[in-house]
Design a protein with these regions (language model features):
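Serine-hydrolase catalytic machinery in alpha/beta-hydrolase-like enzymes
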Residues: 52-63, 70-199, 212, 218
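C-terminal catalytic histidine-bearing segment of alpha/beta-hydrolase fold enzymes
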Residues: 249-252, 258, 282-283, 289-361
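A domain-start/cap signature at the N-terminus of enzymes
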Residues: 33-75, 87-105, 168, 172-177, ...
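Bacterial N-terminal signal peptides
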Residues: 21-31
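Flexible "cap/lid" loop of the alpha/beta hydrolase fold
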Residues: 232-249, 266-267
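N-terminal secretory signal peptides that target proteins for export/translocation
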Residues: 1-16
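Active-site nucleophile loop of the alpha/beta-hydrolase fold
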Residues: 111, 227-234, 254-257
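Active-site rim elements
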Residues: 166-171, 272-280, 332-340
Length: 361
């Protein structure tokens, strides 16, 4: 022991150069060490309320198992279909397990409609769905054949111009896009979320709303990528020609879908719903993806190019590149108006997690 103490006494103090090296290493490693884990508490109640004006908006959150170990977790917000709620996607065990394995935070907000004043189906309002008209003021449906789905809020506010309107009209204080912007800001500032890996996915009516991202820079600037499952924009509401900072977009449709029919490959004509008595007018899948590609700055042609994708998908793009880097991807399955989550969800997560928000967006 005495010999050990003598050795300590004889140790030389670090030189100035050695001290500088130690300080530099600490400076470089310090942020990495402190940023390795999450220092923000999780929401105790998975069902949260976000008050916007006089309206309560609800959302449910599911954390991955390793959430607290990471300061920057990827986030996917999931928009349910018409008549759904925050449980529509999150009650699916396989969907949650797949996201958990990839370390993804899932958040599912609830649309409006089930409460006052509509007391009906929850919905998301997107371009044309509340007014019932195209940009040129023409009906978005064949009103002679399509039933009147107008919500009480649409009749009372007189927002609905025609009987083709079919989603809520509670957007006087804020729109659904406003809600999503507020939700992303809340999650980014109060939870351990990577601001460069925030994504938006919608199914059916939720997928319809996704395309309005091109018209909302406040939202598009926050997103690394978006995905729409079996949801298309109404006639005339394609991505503007000079949209700024568009995130990458994935569209998954069913070739046998009669509700939001995608049309044939490279067919840019408007498609028409043909389920029962509904006759709504939508932009085709090819027109939607081609317009998004052009708005992203890609020189597009009239024919989409096949892109390698896992079976049973047939995927094509109007911009050159692989599945991991094209700005817009059109993928189709032989199915009707359904999700086929077992195939669609892994493809969507791969599409999302291979992309980060462009710096400066």
């Amino acid at each position: 022991n005495d010999r050990f103490l003598m050795r300590l006494i004889r140790l030389k103090p670090p030189s100035v150069r050695q001290w500088c090296h130690l300080v530099l290493v600490g400076f470089l490693l310090g942020p990495m060490i402190t940023a390795a884990s999450c220092d923000r508490p999780v929401f105790v109640n998975p069902l949260q309320v976000l008050q916007i004006g006089s309206i309560e908006r609800h959302f449910r959150i599911v954390y991955p198992t390793n959430y607290s170990a990471n300061a920057h977790n990827p986030l996917v917000i999931l928009l349910h279909g018409w008549g759904g709620n925050e449980d529509a996607f999150l009650d699916q065990d396989d969907l949650r397990r797949t996201a958990d394995a990839r370390g993804v935070v899932l958040v599912a907000p609830r649309g409006l409609g089930s409460g006052a004043p509509d007391f009906g189906n929850n919905s998301w309002t997107f371009s044309g769905s509340d007014t019932g008209v195209t940009e040129a003021g023409m009906p978005i449906c064949d009103a002679a054949l399509t039933p009147d789905y107008r919500y009480p809020s649409c009749k009372a506010s007189k927002i609905a111009v025609t009987t083709c309107a079919w989603t809520h009209c509670q957007g006087q204080s804020h729109t659904d896009i406003d809600f999503l912007v507020e939700l992303f800001v809340l999650l980014e500032t109060q939870q351990c979320i990577d601001p460069d890996r925030m994504y938006l996915m919608g199914g059916s009516n939720g997928g319809n709303l996704v395309w309005d991202v091109a018209r909302a820079p406040r939202l598009s600037n926050k997103l690394a990528a978006v995905a729409s499952w079996i949801g298309l924009p109404h006639q005339s509401y394609l991505a503007p020609g000079k949209a700024s900072a568009l995130p990458a977009a994935l569209l998954i449709t069913g070739t046998k879908d009669t509700t939001d029919p995608p049309g044939a490959w490279d067919d840019f004509n408007v498609t028409t719903t043909s389920n029962q008595t509904d006759r709504y007018f939508y932009e085709s899948a090819s027109a939607t993806i081609r317009a998004w590609s052009a708005a992203s700055g890609c020189p597009v042609g009239a024919v989409a190019t096949p892109v390698a994708a896992p079976p049973p998908f047939d995927c094509r793009a109007y911009c050159p590149g692989e599945r991991q880097d094209v700005p817009a991807l059109d993928c189709r399955l032989e199915m009707g108006h359904e999700y086929r989550e077992g195939d669609a969800w892994p493809l969507t997560l791969d599409f999302f997690l291979s992309r980060h928000r462009a710096r400066g967006s």
